[in-house]
């Protein structure tokens, strides 16, 4: 489960969700239901999973971290209440418009700056989990290649994303983060009870499995 968290999460959702809008699980073929779950925004997948988790084992999440102080390294257990996480509402924007700070130049020297990008869905996460685990640079390249819908009249593929400036890539990743929705999980400040060291921990989906 820990080694393939995105697939494990999707499998739980496949089995536990019985209706999406007007579509019930029993009204479609299993492969179609799987596609529907994979096509959910990652934020929606996470929200649904948190609800299922709360119904199954309660609202409390316990996370263990090690104090970063070299002279301490105490294991610290921290409890989080799922109900206390803020929920960011969906803004209703399906295709997010953008204008790159620097722009992409094609082989003819034409500059392209405007386009649209979509939020990542469950299938994107599964592919990134398999293809780019522990390689954040590659993961970001694949993510943008899959999520950018238009960039001028350029056909989007991995090499286009690799040719973007770091400023443009950072801009697009920040844009996606700004348009996230669902549970606002992320970074939390923790103080070691043993030595008083203060540090920041980041929650991710694997912590909830």
Model region roles, listed by residue range:
Residues 1-209:
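Short, surface-exposed, charged amphipathic helix/loop patches that serve as local interaction elements
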């Amino acid at each position: 489960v820990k080694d393939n968290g995105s697939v494990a999460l999707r499998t739980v959702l496949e089995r536990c969700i019985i209706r999406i809008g007007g579509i019930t699980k029993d009204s479609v073929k299993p492969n179609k239901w799987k596609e529907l779950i994979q096509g959910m925004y990652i934020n929606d997948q996470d929200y649904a999973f948190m609800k299922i988790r709360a119904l199954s084992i309660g609202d409390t999440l316990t996370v263990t971290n090690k104090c970063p102080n070299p002279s301490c390294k105490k294991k610290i257990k921290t409890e989080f209440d799922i109900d206390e996480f803020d929920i960011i509402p969906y803004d209703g924007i399906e295709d997010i418009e953008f204008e790159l700070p620097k722009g992409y130049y094609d082989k003819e020297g034409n500059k392209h700056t405007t386009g649209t990008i979509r939020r990542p869905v469950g299938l994107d996460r599964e592919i990134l989990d398999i293809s780019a685990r522990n390689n954040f640079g590659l993961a970001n390249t694949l993510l943008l290649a899959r999520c950018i819908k238009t960039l001028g009249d350029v056909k989007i593929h991995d090499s286009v994303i690799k040719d973007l400036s770091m400023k443009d890539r950072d801009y697009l990743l920040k844009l996606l983060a700004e348009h996230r929705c669902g549970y606002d999980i992320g970074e939390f400040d923790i103080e070691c009870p043993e030595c008083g060291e203060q540090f920041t921990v980041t929650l991710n989906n694997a912590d909830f499995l």
